[in-house]
Amino acid sequence: MNNIAKHAITMAVVVSALFCGTLFAQPIDIQEQLDALRQRLDDVQSDTEGMRNELDELKVEELDWLTKERADEIRVLVREVLADADARNSLAGDGLLGGWSDGFFLASSDGRFKLNIGGLMQQRFLQNFVRSDVQDRWRGGLESTRTRLNFSGHVFDKDTTFLVQAGYGYLDPNAVLPNFRIADRLWDAWIKFKLDGGWSAKLGVFMLPFTRESLVSDEYQLAVDRSLIDYRLGLARSQGVEFTWAGDATRVFLAMSNGSITLRGVPASQTNPTPPWASLQQDVEWSFTARTEFLLEGRWGQFNQFTSPPGSERGMLWGVAVHAQNGERTGRVGLKQDQVGITSDFSFHSDGVTFFASGTFHNQKNLRATIPNGDWVGYVVQASTYMTDKTEYFVRFASGGVLQDSLGNDDVNILTNGINWYLDGQGLKVTSDFGWNFGEISGGANGSPGMANSMLGWRPQIKQSAQWVFRTQLQLAF
């Protein structure tokens, strides 16, 4: 074998070895590369999960930070509002509250003090006609019959309440003198204390607890005003003390006062027919009034007014009252005017319907030396029904007077028909009525006040069926 052959064989062996080594080495390098790539992917995935977790943590921290920041801002705002409210309250008092809740009010935050502010305005048109040959037949015009503010509430605690009604109105609404002036005056002005066992005590000027017509407030009457009978035979206002006991179905009123003015039983009323009177003025030796009411059905609150709106529940009330007073001497030896009276009334309320009836009797002694007695009687019957939700028709008949002709007469017989338009309940109301007297209206005689009353539109009349009155009234109450 020559050298060339040896070199050729050697080259072939080397090439074969290199080829085989390459073939066996290549799979090992690829596997290593794949393993390296897999490791890198695992590292990238791990890094990605780490970054995702970090992002989630950052989001949570950011939301928490925003929530806390918002809460801090709200806290700061609340503190500023409270500080401003405290600053305002410090100017008006300690914790003063105010607003509207069935009327304007001011109150302390602890509830010990409260002042309610209300009012009443009654703008009235009257047209009167009397068939007469000697006096003005037609008489009428506009007037502000009542304009007053009402202040009520409680002081120190809810057991001590008060009411003050002051404004402009007739100084002699009961035609005691008569006095036709409209000027500044008081209506009710009293302080009331709640006692134990359902009792309460009221001191001041108030309506004596006798007839129900008198006890229903001016703004809650059915017609333009109370009946002519009630203004004469009701007891009107006086000053004194009243004890009240209230149960679920029974109420009792007991009053000791300076007496009733309506039958001229209080000498002081001859110069000042509107209480209060000075303590040393002549009024009465003593005066006592008692009234008991029995709630036969319904609620007490139903009978604070004479109407019963559609949808109201049925209610019945019966009341009975007595009154007695002993007059003071007025310089005439042996003449002390005494007076006793009794009344009873029945009220029925239902769904848009009402009915009311009352009867009253008074006896007076020693009006004049030649007139030992005066006997007064009066009857009132009225009813109403709603024609629409805001329109109510009513009718009333009132009759009575004094039985002795020497003191006047008992020939008052007034039939009244009318309409109520409740524009906004009793708060804004228009009332129109027409009354015709089938009898006579006495102007009074021998110390008797008679039955005429200019505030109600009725003038003295000596002829039968000779007088009528038309009245329209706009009422604003709050």
Model-predicted segments: where are they?
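Bacterial N-terminal signal peptides that target proteins for export
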Residues: 2-12
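Bacterial N-terminal signal peptides
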Residues: 10-22
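N-terminal periplasmic/intermembrane-space "pro-region" immediately following the signal or transit peptide
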Residues: 25-122, 267, 300-303, 473, ...
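Outer-membrane beta-barrel pore domains
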Residues: 28, 136, 190-192, 214, ...
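Intrinsically disordered, low-complexity Ser/Thr- and acidic-rich flexible linkers and loops
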Residues: 84, 270-272, 303-304, 448-460
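Outer membrane beta-barrel
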Residues: 97-262, 282-299, 306-314, 374-394, ...
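Active-site-proximal beta-alpha loop/turn segments in soluble metabolic enzymes
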Residues: 260-279
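Interfacial loop-to-helix transition and helix-capping segments at the boundaries
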Residues: 275-283, 337-339
